[in-house]
Amino acid sequence: MDSFLRLLIHGASGRMGQALLRLASEDPSFQVAAAVVGQAPDRHVSDGVPFFAAAELAAVPAFDVAIDFSLPQGFSSLLALCVARAVPLVSGTTGLDSRQHEALVMAGAQIPLVWGSNFSVGMAVLVNLVERAGDALSGWDCDIVESHHVHKQDAPSGSALTLGEAVACKGIAPRYTSLRAGDIVGDHLVQFTGLGERIELVHRATNRDVFARGALYVARRVVGRVPGCYRVRDLIM
């Protein structure tokens, strides 16, 4: 039996994909079976890793788990491939539409999968703290401010929406503010405001590696689990 997991990286040309390629190559518990990029790759093999264009997805070799940080346009094809091959999927692709989220839930009846807007340990803790604050602060105002680099397309960020869901389930309607500036990796502020006082909970990511390490950790943990839709914090905390 192999001592490593064969990993498919989907969205390998993006910032997260590049971090995953680098960190997975340094981790003896993984072997990158294939890397998928949007357009035809410049080189079909790089550092021993075979690269495939998104249109060639069906041709990728066997893999034990897929990690996806891509765009919504390519997500559905990967989900279908993982279901067809009965392989777990870990996805951090944000901006999915309602039909894609429904497809995720349906796929969870057949394979173990994790969709998350943020794979850092700190964000998992922040979501937990926000839920607990929501329990204690009913009637307070809640504002969520997220800041990211200028190239991030979706707003509010997926992480901001996850934080918003954590307070919305407590009966609090959050307001969102999105900032796009410079090369900010990811800042999230959750502010609860009452009469004469306020509480601020903040998470700042200064290096994209925290998300990639978290995704690799979750990928190791989800392999071998029964089919279902798992939360990041189910596997990190």
Curated annotation (Swiss-Prot):
HAMAP family recorded for this chain?
A: DapB
- Organism of this sequence: Xylella fastidiosa (strain 9a5c)
Keywords from UniProt, A to Z, are: Amino-acid biosynthesis, Cytoplasm, Diaminopimelate biosynthesis, Lysine biosynthesis, NAD, NADP, Oxidoreductase
The gene name reads dapB
Which PANTHER family does this chain map to?
Answer: 4-HYDROXY-TETRAHYDRODIPICOLINATE REDUCTASE 1, CHLOROPLASTIC-RELATED, DIHYDRODIPICOLINATE REDUCTASE
Q: What protein family is recorded?
A: Belongs to the DapB family.
**What are the BP-aspect GO terms?**
diaminopimelate biosynthetic process; lysine biosynthetic process via diaminopimelate
Protein name listed in UniProt: 4-hydroxy-tetrahydrodipicolinate reductase
Which pathway does the database say it acts in? Answer: Amino-acid biosynthesis; L-lysine biosynthesis via DAP pathway; (S)-tetrahydrodipicolinate from L-aspartate: step 4/4
* Functional summary from the UniProt entry: Catalyzes the conversion of 4-hydroxy-tetrahydrodipicolinate (HTPA) to tetrahydrodipicolinate.
State the GO CC annotations: cytosol
Q: Which CDD domains match?
A: DHDPR_N (cd02274)
Its lineage opens with: Bacteria, Pseudomonadati, Pseudomonadota, Gammaproteobacteria, Lysobacterales
Major localization listed first in the record, in broad terms: cytoplasm
